[in-house]
Amino acid sequence: MLKYNLMERANPITNKTMFHANLVPATPFPLEMIVANVCENCNIKPIQLLNALYYLEKEIIKALQDGYSVRLGDIGSFHLRLSSVSVPSKEDFSAESLRSLKVRFIPNTRMKKELSLTNSKVVLVREDECNEERGKGNEV
């Protein structure tokens, strides 16, 4: 179940206040649980899977540092994005104009489909409604 809340924001152009939905920060699902779940379905020991994931991470980092995008089959792909300061002309641009590199993950088609609002397995609940339901069972 995914929880969301409504945030009030003022539109800087029209100065009208509007409400927008935001996902409530999710509780992290630890790697150890993912490894345990995968190992239940495969003939592999948890330490072997953790070792493979460790080296997978190293290879992804190395490939990104070498300028490649990295595709992980039906999971998706990673690539780097560069952030810089805007300058009026090419001549004004220097290495100091560069701000940061950001790692981007783009899910593959199947993952996008599985995590879309049209999928019946994706359940969204407004946080305040979820809390009201939880409180009803505790009333005396």
Report residues per predicted region.
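Strongly charged
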Residues: 1-51, 55-140
